[in-house]
């Protein structure tokens, strides 16, 4: 797969001040928590506490694809219009600006993360799809798969001053 520039530039290169668009007609962004597990044990995080001593947010550690697809399908009210729809519906409806794969766990641990990104992109669930990750599980194949699936941005979270503190 060829390289593609991925940066933090705003959609269409334009930024609008939040004060100009409030109140919003739709949610600005949705945070999706695909997994409740992590490959790190950062001192500030609930995953550093022994499993027996911490309450689970959910009974299932991994979000199943059926539930995920239902959530994405339910977001259709905020879907990005196609070019044809934009021509016939003027002005285009407000859309969800961003879908973030993040949360109480490491999203790249989900076995179907590439398919999750692909499904969200196919459904035009948001203008921007991104993942917040600690980066430890990134491989060339995974990066290629995520980019091919339509991921717009990967954000690496560094939460420490040195390697020992980070791990």
Regions found by a protein language model. Give the residues of each.
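Conserved nucleotide-binding/hydrolysis micro-motifs of P-loop NTPases
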Residues: 161
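Conserved alpha-helical substructure of the radical SAM core
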Residues: 2-153, 164-165
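Conserved phosphate-donor/acceptor-positioning beta-strand/loop module used by diverse small-molecule
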Residues: 156-158
């Amino acid at each position: 797969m060829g390289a593609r520039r991925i940066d933090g530039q705003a959609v269409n290169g334009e930024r609008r001040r939040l004060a100009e668009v409030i109140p919003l007609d739709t949610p600005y962004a949705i945070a999706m928590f695909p997994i409740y597990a992590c490959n790190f044990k950062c001192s500030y995080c609930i995953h550093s506490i022994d499993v027996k001593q911490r309450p689970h947010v959910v009974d299932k550690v991994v979000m199943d694809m059926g539930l995920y697809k239902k959530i994405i399908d339910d977001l259709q009210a905020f879907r990005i219009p196609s070019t044809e729809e934009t021509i016939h519906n003027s002005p285009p409806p407000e859309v969800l600006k961003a879908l973030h794969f993040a949360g109480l766990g490491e999203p790249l641990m989900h076995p179907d993360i590439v398919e999750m990104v692909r499904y969200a992109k196919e459904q035009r669930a948001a203008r921007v799809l991104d993942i917040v990750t600690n980066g430890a599980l990134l491989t060339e194949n995974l990066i290629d798969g995520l980019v091919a699936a339509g991921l717009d941005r990967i954000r690496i979270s560094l939460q420490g001053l040195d390697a020992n503190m980070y791990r």
